[in-house]
Amino acid sequence: LLAGDPYYCQCQKTARLVAERLGLQPEQWAVAFQSRFGGAEWLQPYASVLLAEWAKAGVKSVDVACPGFAADCLETLEEIALENRQVFLAAGGERYRYLPALNDDPAHIAALADLMSRHAAGWPEFAPGYDADALARERTATRQRALALGAAA
């Protein structure tokens, strides 16, 4: 990440946009990270740790989504849907619901096909309706949110 990997920021942005679309307040959602393995430290907070903390603090019900996954896989089905469910319930939670990825939903496939078609056809930046000023404003706002979350300037 310190070398410029945008993954963390992309996760934060996606989660924020989903939460806004759902009308959630900041205290109603969080971003956590999965798939720790090996000796290297991974992005935090870790999903299993956060879920256990929430359950111990009295949170009884959670819905868990992984918007970074276009389709479910071993990580989402085994680690997130099953193992993290066990962690949450063992720590005192009562209801854990994993919301599956979009997988082969027709609207999802159509959106992916449209996105790929636009990018395969050339530079989307030169397409009609492209607004460079709006993109610049969004990048500035994204940077301000990242700094507020503790990113280095």
What label would you give each PLM region?
Residues 1-153:
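Extended amphipathic ligand-handling, pore-lining, and cofactor/metal-binding catalytic surfaces
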